């Protein structure tokens, strides 16, 4: 007969850190080159004009401008950046 009480172990009791995914810059917002537009797993959104994609599928602006979302049906949802007109210094 055992004189110690058997102590069970739990297979639960852990949690992962939050990943902070999602859209970071919405349609119409002004962005500068390098701004992160979307953090995602897989290609929920695809890069359009003036948008690059990192190796973790993060979309980021390649130029200064305004964010534009477009839905191309079966091809998917695309994010583009409309380049801002270059500022010309007045002499």
Curated annotation (Swiss-Prot):
The UniProt annotation puts the region (Disordered) at 1-20
Q: Which Gene3D superfamilies match?
A: 2.40.50.100
Q: What is this protein called?
A: Large ribosomal subunit protein bL27
- Stated family: Belongs to the bacterial ribosomal protein bL27 family.
| Keyword Acetylation listed | no
Q: Extract the PROSITE patterns matched here.
A: RIBOSOMAL_L27
Q: Name one GO molecular function term.
A: structural constituent of ribosome
Domain of life from the UniProt record: Bacteria
| Any Pfam family hit | Ribosomal_L27
Q: Which PANTHER family match?
A: LARGE RIBOSOMAL SUBUNIT PROTEIN BL27M (PTHR15893:SF0), RIBOSOMAL PROTEIN L27 (PTHR15893)
Instruction: Show the InterPro entries listed in the entry.
Output: Ribosomal_bL27 (IPR001684), Ribosomal_bL27_CS (IPR018261)
Q: Which UniProt keywords apply?
A: Ribonucleoprotein, Ribosomal protein
One GO BP on record is: translation
Q: What's a GO cellular component annotated to this UniProt protein?
A: cytosolic large ribosomal subunit
């Amino acid at each position: 007969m055992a004189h110690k009480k058997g102590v069970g172990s739990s297979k639960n009791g852990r949690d992962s850190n939050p990943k902070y995914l999602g859209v970071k810059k919405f349609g119409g917002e002004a962005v500068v080159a390098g701004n992160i537009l979307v953090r995602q797993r897989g290609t929920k959104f695809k890069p359009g004009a003036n948008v690059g994609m990192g190796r973790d599928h993060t979309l980021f602006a390649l130029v200064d401008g305004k964010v534009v979302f477009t839905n191309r049906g079966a091809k998917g949802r695309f994010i583009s950046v409309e380049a801002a007109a270059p500022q010309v210094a007045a002499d």
